[in-house]
């Protein structure tokens, strides 16, 4: 806090420049022109800059270490204190001593700008508080000792040290003189809540800071009540509020109601809540709302990735995947028997979209390898796929496409056997549905899928690459644009096989190395 000094008024014949000030019936000061006080401050700052030819070097401020206080620990400690009962004693705020030597302050007599403000009935004050800004700007407050002592444990302590009838306190290096004036003025207010309602969140936080420094507990509580009720607009404002609350050191004030807006007493986000959200999204009957919420939840989970998430959340996702797979298999069986074809087609499209979304979630969390194993082993589903009309089945190939894209991007790294089984089981069904995917799915990106398929094939041994690409070549030559274009992968395989056959050279080189090592 700013440094405090006891001053004697009789020793300083200060020339105070009065500004237009109106005193309310409650004793609170206000300027007829709302910007009068700010203009005085600004004009003084500009004059000071012109007059100073070589500004004094300011001492370096010590770096503030970030507080390790957590929201939950503050809530827990605050609730414990409330359970113990109300506090009878008021703790005063200690004024930290100035560690580093400062340049000598300009004398009050030579200051170019001064403002005088009187609280309460004119001529009834019995104390003075002089606020001296860092650049010499001075505000002289005519106040009442009883009001200061009743509301501020800081002023009560300082005034108790003085013996004179008329006390004068000087606060030096005051960073925010305007807020000091407003906070002291709140001591004369009968209804602080009504006064604070006219302010914004940023200004109330500044008042809260000054109120804590002055030990003005009723003002601190009023500020907390205001912050608990008022909306916080934007993440930046929310961060300011929370950081200010966590820095509070005054005991006996309840910060829990404010902090409960952003934190609960639960140690971890409950698994049941996450499961419920996933279930609600997957079971939504309204397509537009379901699509929007899938996008929002995926974005939030992406932001939460690496943060404190329930360890068993992946189990929840895989449980939902299995439920969707069972539903798809049942729908395929019904559709193959000709039962309710239109209803089955719509529901298959919904379940396929759900599986694709769950795969997106797992890929973001780098936990999709198990899904690739499960999908590669869906042989019964792949056999039923051939029996269904294109209109009913092609949505399922979106899941296969998403897996190939993920492998091509390196989002999941299944084993060689899993990659080969995936291509063996689902590549031909994807070829058969490819033309419908291109024209029937707005979100389908053919170039991305083709790149993913090609990269997946090229991760296999050369013999498997040859087998799969020759099979693709026959389909492509017969189907044309209705088949994925894997020409890039075909060129890479060709060069590996015929232009740069590394295998023979490496085999010969390794044999020579082995024989040389044996001779030695």
Swiss-Prot record:
InterPro entries: BTB/POZ_dom_prot (IPR038920). The keyword Amino-acid biosynthesis does not apply. Pathway: Protein modification; protein ubiquitination. Residues 127-196 form the BTB domain. GO terms for biological process: protein ubiquitination. Keywords: Ubl conjugation pathway. Residues 43-68 are annotated as: Disordered. May act as a substrate-specific adapter of an E3 ubiquitin-protein ligase complex (CUL3-RBX1-BTB) which mediates the ubiquitination and subsequent proteasomal degradation of target proteins. The BTB/POZ domain mediates the interaction with some component of ubiquitin ligase complexes. This is BTB/POZ domain-containing protein At3g50780. It comes from Arabidopsis thaliana.
């Amino acid at each position: 806090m700013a440094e405090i000094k006891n001053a004697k008024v009789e020793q300083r014949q200060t020339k105070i420049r009065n500004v237009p000030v109106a005193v309310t019936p409650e004793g609170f000061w206000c300027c007829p022109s709302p910007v009068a006080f700010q203009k005085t401050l600004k004009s003084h700052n500009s004059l000071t800059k012109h007059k100073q030819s070589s500004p004094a070097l300011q001492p370096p401020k010590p770096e503030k270490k970030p507080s390790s206080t957590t929201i939950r620990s503050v809530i827990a400690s605050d609730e414990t204190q409330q359970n113990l009962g109300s506090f009878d004693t008021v703790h005063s705020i200690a004024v930290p001593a100035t560690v580093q030597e400062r340049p000598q302050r300009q004398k009050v007599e030579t200051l170019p700008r001064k403002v005088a403000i009187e609280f309460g009935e004119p001529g009834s004050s019995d104390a003075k508080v002089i606020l001296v800004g860092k650049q010499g700007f001075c505000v002289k407050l005519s106040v009442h000792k009883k009001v200061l002592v009743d509301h501020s444990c800081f002023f009560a302590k300082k005034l108790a040290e003085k013996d004179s009838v008329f006390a004068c306190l000087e606060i030096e290096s005051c960073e925010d003189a305007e807020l000091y004036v407003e906070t002291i003025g709140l001591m004369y207010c009968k209804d602080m809540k009504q006064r604070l309602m006219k302010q914004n969140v940023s200004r109330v936080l500044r008042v809260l800071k000054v109120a804590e420094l002055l030990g003005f507990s009723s003002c601190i509580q009023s500020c907390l009540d205001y912050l608990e009720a008022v909306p916080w607009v934007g993440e930046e404002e929310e961060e300011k509020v929370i950081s200010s609350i966590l820095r509070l050191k005054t005991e006996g004030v309840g910060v829990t109601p404010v902090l409960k807006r952003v934190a609960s007493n639960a140690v971890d986000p409950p698994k049941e809540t996450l499961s419920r959200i996933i279930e609600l999204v997957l079971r939504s009957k309204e397509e537009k709302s379901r699509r929007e919420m899938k996008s929002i939840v995926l974005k939030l989970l992406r932001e939460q990735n690496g943060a404190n998430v329930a360890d068993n959340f992946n189990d929840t996702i895989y449980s939902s995947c299995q439920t969707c797979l069972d539903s798809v298999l049942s729908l395929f069986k019904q559709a193959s028997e000709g039962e309710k074809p239109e209803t089955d087609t719509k529901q298959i499209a919904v379940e396929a979209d759900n599986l694709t979304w769950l795969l997106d979630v797992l890929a973001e969390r780098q936990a999709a390898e198990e899904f690739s194993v499960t999908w590669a082993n869906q042989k019964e589903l792949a056999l039923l796929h051939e029996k269904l009309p294109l209109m009913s089945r092609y949505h399922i190939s979106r899941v296969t496409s998403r897996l190939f894209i993920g492998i091509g991007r390196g989002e999941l790294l299944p084993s060689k056997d899993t990659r080969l089984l995936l291509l063996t089981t689902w590549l031909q069904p994807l070829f058969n549905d490819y033309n419908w995917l291109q024209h029937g799915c707005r979100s389908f990106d053919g170039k991305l899928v083709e790149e993913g398929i090609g990269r997946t094939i090229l991760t296999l041994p050369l013999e498997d690459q040859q087998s799969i690409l020759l099979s693709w070549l026959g389909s492509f030559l017969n189907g044309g644009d209705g088949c994925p274009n894997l020409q890039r992968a075909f060129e890479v395989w060709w060069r590996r096989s015929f232009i740069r056959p590394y295998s023979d050279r490496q085999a010969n080189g390794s044999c020579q190395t082995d024989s040389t090592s044996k001779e030695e």
